[in-house]
Swiss-Prot record:
InterPro entries: GPCR_Rhodpsn (IPR000276), GPCR_Rhodpsn_7TM (IPR017452), Melcrt_ACTH_rcpt (IPR001671), MSH_rcpt (IPR000761). This is Melanocyte-stimulating hormone receptor. One of its GO terms (cellular component) is plasma membrane. The lineage of its organism: Eukaryota, Metazoa, Chordata, Craniata, Vertebrata. Keywords: Cell membrane, G-protein coupled receptor, Glycoprotein, Lipoprotein, Membrane, Palmitate, Receptor, Transducer, Transmembrane, Transmembrane helix.
Length: 317
């Protein structure tokens, strides 16, 4: 779990080019004086991870406690929270271990440290993949609930949801091991990027279609009650704003990391790309920020879940 300059080892394999030249530590004339490197203090990294950890633990606890929340939709939300929890927890663990090793407070053999680092990398990578998958699964679940409302409970059953969850977890672990083992192959990095773009397109298409259906429904109600057109327009603008925020946060938090992977393949030695590579820790911090925001978007908006969460917090006191 060594640190290269200011670069954390976490997913360090994804922060190296297929060649032996490292991205960090380049000469000043290679990146230029204009190159901006955003430093993420370890304290901030740990704080973000802790906030995400607490939030997602609360979501998992609330869903596990309330049997009314044991439905396919909340099953996906719970697994999303668990994935985000693992993303944050593995980042916190590696940061803490790295700091202890640097301070000399933790003595370990190089082989042990390397094995620990590999395990943490697999957990981090698999939880990131599963998080993206569950975001897509939630979008599909909501789409079916709107466009196939009468058949929803026969299409999306709890056993099917559990099988889908198991398949996502198994595939995420297997593919993460494959990606980390062959990280120096351009095809592997491109597969990760294509996977991210596929999830982005899937979510965008489904949510835009759902927004269009909601606007049509609102327009029909407005005509039925002979309301004025501005009311329908206001609903459409509100829905569009919500959709923009949802997809915007997803792209803002995940996009830079996958841009990083794309540039590793396209321009590993270019000065501009080398400058972007310096901000790898910032891209990881944005993913942790997404793990903080996910519960606010998908979980805490549920009145039933908030009520259960309140009971859990009161009982803990």
């Amino acid at each position: 779990m060594p640190v290269q300059g200011s670069q954390r080892r976490l997913l360090g394999s994804l922060n190296s080019t297929p060649t032996a030249t490292p991205h960090l530590g380049l000469a000043a004339n290679q990146t230029g004086a204009w190159c901006l490197e955003v430093s993420i203090p370890d304290g901030l990294f740990l704080s973000l991870g802790l906030v995400s950890l607490v939030e997602n633990v609360l979501v998992v606890t609330a869903i596990a406690k309330n049997r009314n929340l044991h439905s396919p939709m909340y099953c996906f939300i719970c697994c999303l929270a668990l994935s985000d929890l693992l993303v944050s927890g593995s980042n916190m663990l590696e940061t803490a271990v790295t700091l202890l090793l640097e301070a000399g407070a933790l003595a370990a053999r190089a082989a042990v440290v390397q094995q620990l680092d590999n395990v943490i990398d697999v957990i981090t990578c698999s939880s990131m993949l599963s998080s993206l998958c569950f975001l897509g699964a939630i979008a599909v679940d909501r789409y079916i609930s709107i466009f196939y409302a009468l058949r929803y409970h026969s299409i999306v059953t709890l056993p099917r949801a559990r099988r889908a969850v198991a398949a996502i977890w198994v595939a995420s672990v297997l593919f993460s091991m494959l990606f980390i083992a062959y990280y120096d192959h351009a095809a592997v990095l491109l597969c990760l990027v294509v996977f991210f773009l596929a999830m982005l397109v899937l979510m965008a298409v489904l949510y835009v279609h759902m927004l269009a259906r909601a606007c049509q429904h609102a327009q029909g109600i407005a005509r039925l009650h002979k309301r004025q057109r501005p009311a329908h327009q206001g609903f459409g603008l509100k829905g569009a704003a919500t959709l923009t925020i949802l997809l915007g946060i997803f792209f803002l938090c995940w996009g830079p990391f996958f841009l990083h992977l794309t540039l590793i393949v396209l321009c590993p030695q270019h000065p501009t790309c080398s400058c972007i590579f310096k901000n790898f820790n910032l891209f990881l911090a944005l993913i942790i920020c997404n793990a903080i925001i996910d519960p606010l978007i998908y979980a805490f908006r549920s009145q039933e879940l908030r009520r259960t969460l309140k009971e859990v917090l009161l009982c803990s006191w």
